[in-house]
Structure formats: C-alpha cells, structure tokens
C-alpha cells in the first residue's frame, strides 16, 4: 500500500469520528470569524436558524458572537495540521474562508501577507478537496472577492471605464489585491480538479 493511500485511510478513519469518538456533527466552518465580515456572517447565519456554525480566528471571539456558534477555536490557517484536526472534528459542508492579512498590513509585511493570504488559502482548499474525496461529497469553499483585485493605471482611465465587468481590469496594485486574485484562480483550479 502506498504511503499516500495509507495516510488517506488513516485520515478517513480519524475523520469519521470527532476527537472524543463521537460521530462528526454537520457544520459550516468560518475562518477569520473575528473580522467585520465574519461577525456579520455569523449573525446572519444565526438569524437564519443555523446552529452548526464553527468559527475560528487568531483571537478569541467576543461573548455575543461565541454564543451564536456551535464551536469556536483559536486557530491559524497557516497551521495545516491544526486546520486538518479541527476540520476532522466536524462533517463540514461549507467553509467561508475569511482569514486574511488586509491591504495596509500586507503592504508593510508582504511576506506575512503572502503566507497568510496564499498559504492559508491553499491549506483550506486542499483540506476541503481531501475531505471531499474521502467522503464522496464536495465541501463548498466560499472565498469573498475584493475591490483590491481590480486596478487602473490612472484616475482618468477609471472615470472613462464606467461600470466594470467581473473579468475586466484585473490588475491589482497592492500585495493584498495580488494575493486575492491569485487565490481566486487557485479556487478555480481546485474546483476543476
């Protein structure tokens, strides 16, 4: 038996039950839940009656947000092993991947921005793909876009362009925008493989 199939069998065996030996509960998983979009998303899902929200962030979520979730964890999307362990505890149907180093910080620390924005996204996409293969059911990854993926060389060009289509002017001018656009393409790649 190859080492890859051995690893997949071991992961499948450990993923079929949660960390306490209980069957995995269905869950919607949110990375970067402590940000503005994360708070809004958790609130909207909770108001919609969802009780299966599992949220992660680098910092502890506030009490109100924690009460709307079925589980909250301190976790770093760059830590692939930690993400695999967390995701294996649940039967994840959807992942809202919101964790990111945003524009200003990514400009001052481009390597950190790349590590989190690209490396963390690859971790999430690969884990979702692995779980989809193991259980024969795709895991949907929702990765919101950003205006930062677009770019114009001048204000005049921007004014002249008017309404911009989804696939026009994809010339980001910030590290964050470059990371986001690249990760959108990674998402397309993983969706097709």
Enumerate the predicted regions with their spans.
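Conserved Rossmann-fold NAD(P)-dependent oxidoreductase catalytic core, especially the SDR/UDP-sugar
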Residues: 122-175
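NAD(P)H-binding glycine-rich loop region in Rossmannoid oxidoreductase-like domains
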Residues: 70-71, 77-116
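Conserved glycine-rich Rossmann-like NAD(P)H-binding loop of the short-chain dehydrogenase/reductase
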Residues: 49-62
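Active-site Tyr-X1-5-Lys
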Residues: 155, 171-193
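N-terminal Rossmann NAD(P)H-binding glycine-rich loop of SDR-like oxidoreductase domains
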Residues: 21, 25-48
